[in-house]
Each structure stands twice: as C-alpha cells, then as structure tokens.
Amino acid sequence: MHHRDLLAIIIISALLFINVILWGFILRKYLEQKEQDRKEREILERLRRIREIRDDSDYESNGEEEQEVMDLVLSHGFDNPMFEP
C-alpha cells in the first residue's frame, strides 16, 4: 500500500466514525423528545379528564386529582408557572 492509500483509508475511517457519533447523538435527542412528548400527552389527558369530571354537576373536588397532576408535571421537569405550588 502506498502512503496515499493508507491516508485515504484513515480519512474515510475517521469520517465514518464521526458519522456514527453524529447519528447516535441525533437518535438520542429524538428519543428524548419523543419521551417528552409522551409525558406531555399524559399530562394533557389527565387535565382533560379532570375538566370533564369537573363539568359534571356532581363533581366534588378534594384537590387530590389536581395535586396528582401538579406532582406529575413537576416530577417530569416541566417548567410552567401555572403548575407551581
């Protein structure tokens, strides 16, 4: 092998390695975003259920459901002043 061939193999290997690292980073960010979206959907679904129950005429709130949603929001790291205690 000539030095030029060896240098080309090293450069191609380095570029492939960088490509794998980059795609791994992108995949990790995508999965984190997907998990965040799932948590948001769960919270919104609980809030929707609470509102539906509240719209019923016989709804008596002891604050337990609202506190459960607030704890869920805070435990998932959402930073929304509406949910601050």
Curated annotation (Swiss-Prot):
<dbReference type="GO" id="GO:0019076">
    <property type="term" value="P:viral release from host cell"/>
</dbReference>
<feature type="transmembrane region" description="Helical">
    <location>
        <begin position="8"/>
        <end position="28"/>
    </location>
</feature>
<keyword id="KW-1090">Inhibition of host innate immune response by virus</keyword>
<keyword id="KW-0407">Ion channel</keyword>
<keyword id="KW-0597">Phosphoprotein</keyword>
<keyword id="KW-0472">Membrane</keyword>
<feature type="topological domain" description="Cytoplasmic">
    <location>
        <begin position="29"/>
        <end position="85"/>
    </location>
</feature>
<dbReference type="GO" id="GO:0039587">
    <property type="term" value="P:symbiont-mediated-mediated suppression of host tetherin activity"/>
</dbReference>
<dbReference type="GO" id="GO:0039502">
    <property type="term" value="P:symbiont-mediated suppression of host type I interferon-mediated signaling pathway"/>
</dbReference>
<keyword id="KW-1084">Inhibition of host tetherin by virus</keyword>
<keyword id="KW-0899">Viral immunoevasion</keyword>
<dbReference type="GO" id="GO:0005261">
    <property type="term" value="F:monoatomic cation channel activity"/>
</dbReference>
<keyword id="KW-0945">Host-virus interaction</keyword>
<protein>
    <recommendedName>
        <fullName>Protein Vpu</fullName>
    </recommendedName>
</protein>
<dbReference type="GO" id="GO:0042609">
    <property type="term" value="F:CD4 receptor binding"/>
</dbReference>
<keyword id="KW-1043">Host membrane</keyword>
<dbReference type="GO" id="GO:0052170">
    <property type="term" value="P:symbiont-mediated suppression of host innate immune response"/>
</dbReference>
<dbReference type="GO" id="GO:0016020">
    <property type="term" value="C:membrane"/>
</dbReference>
<keyword id="KW-0813">Transport</keyword>
<dbReference type="GO" id="GO:0032801">
    <property type="term" value="P:receptor catabolic process"/>
</dbReference>
<comment type="subunit">
    <text>Homopentamer. Interacts with host CD4 and BRTC; these interactions induce proteasomal degradation of CD4. Interacts with host BST2; this interaction leads to the degradation of host BST2. Interacts with host FBXW11. Interacts with host AP1M1; this interaction plays a role in the mistrafficking and subsequent degradation of host BST2. Interacts with host RANBP2; this interaction allows Vpu to down-regulate host BLM sumoylation.</text>
</comment>
<feature type="topological domain" description="Extracellular">
    <location>
        <begin position="1"/>
        <end position="7"/>
    </location>
</feature>
<keyword id="KW-0406">Ion transport</keyword>
<dbReference type="GO" id="GO:0033644">
    <property type="term" value="C:host cell membrane"/>
</dbReference>
<comment type="function">
    <text>Enhances virion budding by targeting host CD4 and Tetherin/BST2 to proteasome degradation. Degradation of CD4 prevents any unwanted premature interactions between viral Env and its host receptor CD4 in the endoplasmic reticulum. Degradation of antiretroviral protein Tetherin/BST2 is important for virion budding, as BST2 tethers new viral particles to the host cell membrane. Mechanistically, Vpu bridges either CD4 or BST2 to BTRC, a substrate recognition subunit of the Skp1/Cullin/F-box protein E3 ubiquitin ligase, induces their ubiquitination and subsequent proteasomal degradation.</text>
</comment>
<keyword id="KW-0053">Apoptosis</keyword>
<keyword id="KW-0812">Transmembrane</keyword>
<keyword id="KW-0014">AIDS</keyword>
<comment type="similarity">
    <text>Belongs to the HIV-1 VPU protein family.</text>
</comment>
<dbReference type="Pfam" id="PF00558">
    <property type="entry name" value="Vpu"/>
</dbReference>
<dbReference type="InterPro" id="IPR008187">
    <property type="entry name" value="Vpu"/>
</dbReference>
<keyword id="KW-1133">Transmembrane helix</keyword>
